[in-house]
């Protein structure tokens, strides 16, 4: 048995900010995917995934039935029979590994599910987001529900604020454009929960809160607007500012060995780096006006282009 594929995602803008009502923009990333599967001879990895699913089933039994109900016994017996999530999405990389799993489970086992084929009103999108937030919180404490939403619908999503989200049309790519958004592999697995904990601790300080509002959220919102309008010039100006703010105020989320590289981008204007997801490792997002220059400048690292300007 093998179920339909669910894809990874990239939160282009809005990491951390969306916890505090900044704008955000999330796009599907079809390079990685996952599907529910059962094998005759499962690998170690499949068995590990199966164990995790079995704990997930217990968690889903306790979810508020007013919110969502599942074919829970069917799910439990499928898991009992060895079902696992077969995924190429790297875990701890900020591209939504648990989100795709949540989307796959909802798709297959939820009652009265909202589907991508119907007219997706704001209410329906929000309801899905709340359901997914509840489901995904099993994996890392506090989830916004956005990753599974993106994976489930496989369309770009614009977050205007916590309770105002909509599907978005993003400008068509210029396939031979020199400008690019890319992923840089840090080679380190990042853990989401401790990073979110650091952020929440910082939020207790007045100075950090006002920096978030006056700098981080301001530039994040501007980046989202620029990207959707296709205003590349302004986008790079704002991305540079955002990159600076992150370097100055989100240092623990940037792996130590990337601090200099981060600074170099800002100083040379060859590329600007930002967090991809919660940081701490995994992928780092990069924006450049000239991908060849960026590749040269970052030649010791593996870059994957995800969007061309």
Model-predicted regions and their roles:
Residues 123-169:
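Alpha/beta catalytic cores of group-transfer enzymes, especially the acyltransferase/condensing modules
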Residues 15, 19, 217-309:
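Glycine-rich, charge-dense phosphate/pyrophosphate-binding loop(s)
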Residues 169-224:
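Acyltransferase
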């Amino acid at each position: 048995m093998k179920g339909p594929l669910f894809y990874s995602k990239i939160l282009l803008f809005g990491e951390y900010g969306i916890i505090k009502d900044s704008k955000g923009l999330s796009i599907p990333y079809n390079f990685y995917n996952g599907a529910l599967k059962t094998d005759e001879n499962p690998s170690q990895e499949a068995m590990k995934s199966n164990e995790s699913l079995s704990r997930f089933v217990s968690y889903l039994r306790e979810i508020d039935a007013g919110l969502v109900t599942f074919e829970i016994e069917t799910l439990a017996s499928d898991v009992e029979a060895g079902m696992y999530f077969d995924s190429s999405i790297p875990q701890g990389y900020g591209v939504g590994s648990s989100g795709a799993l949540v989307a796959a489970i909802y798709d297959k086992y939820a009652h009265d599910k909202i589907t991508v084929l119907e007219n997706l009103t704001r209410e329906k999108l929000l309801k899905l987001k709340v359901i997914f937030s509840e489901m995904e919180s099993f994996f890392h404490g506090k989830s916004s529900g956005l990753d599974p939403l993106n994976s489930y619908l496989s369309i770009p999503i614009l977050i205007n604020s916590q309770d105002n989200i909509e599907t978005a049309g993003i400008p068509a790519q210029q396939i031979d454009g020199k400008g690019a958004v890319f992923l840089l592999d840090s080679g380190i697995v990042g853990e989401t929960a401790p990073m979110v904990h650091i952020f929440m601790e910082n939020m207790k300080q007045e100075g950090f809160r006002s920096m978030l509002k006056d700098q981080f959220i301001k530039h994040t919102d501007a980046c989202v607007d620029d990207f959707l309008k296709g205003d590349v010039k302004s986008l790079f100006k704002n991305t540079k500012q955002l990159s600076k703010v992150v370097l100055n105020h989100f240092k623990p989320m940037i792996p130590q060995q990337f601090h200099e590289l981060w600074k170099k981008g800002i100083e040379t204007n060859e590329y600007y780096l930002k967090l991809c997801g919660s940081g701490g490792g995994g992928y780092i997002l990069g924006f450049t006006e000239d991908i060849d220059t960026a590749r040269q400048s970052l030649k010791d690292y593996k870059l994957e282009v995800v969007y061309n300007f």
